[in-house]
Amino acid sequence: LRARKFKIGYVPQYGGYFHDLTLLENLKAVGEIIIKDQRKRQEKIASLISKFALDNVQEIKAKFLSGGQRRKLVICMALLGDPKILLCDEIFAALDVLTIHMLKEILVNLQNENPKICIIICEHQARELLSIVDRALILSNCKIIAEGSPNNLIKDEKAKSQYFGDFFKN
């Protein structure tokens, strides 16, 4: 409830949904807590289902959805309250390349459509993350070792030695 008060949406690395409920039931369950007006709630849910191309799976139980569909469901759940801050924990974890590409497009589109939303992503897949962010921090042992634009981070000697290694060499 505190997150709702401060307009924060959270996308966990794993889970974050009710396995035995359908995609639609998951959205309705969370929507009832976040959006009191039934008409607005139904409109928001319908809009998110359409926007995330989940129309054809809305009656399927969450446990039977693909990894990408589940991740989209959890993003939709996080967006129900129109957050000002969206926290994403390891959003690309355990997903195939095509699904990662799809999620990157979703995040970029979300930022473009809502320029005031701040999307914070904790992610180990540097190449994937740096291709879509404006700014990044690299942490090591709970300390910031480098920060800046993706281009600057790739060139940063401390970031190279402690995190990237030869990862970005041609």
Segment roles from a protein language model:
Residues 86-89:
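Catalytic Walker B motif of ABC-type/P-loop ATPase nucleotide-binding domains
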Residues 39-57, 108:
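Conserved ABC ATPase "signature" region
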Residues 14, 21-32:
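Q-loop/switch helix immediately C-terminal to the Walker
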Residues 75:
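Hydrophobic anchor residue at the start of the ABC signature
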Residues 61-65:
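Conserved ABC ATPase signature
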Residues 1-9, 14, 153-157:
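ABC ATPase NBD coupling module
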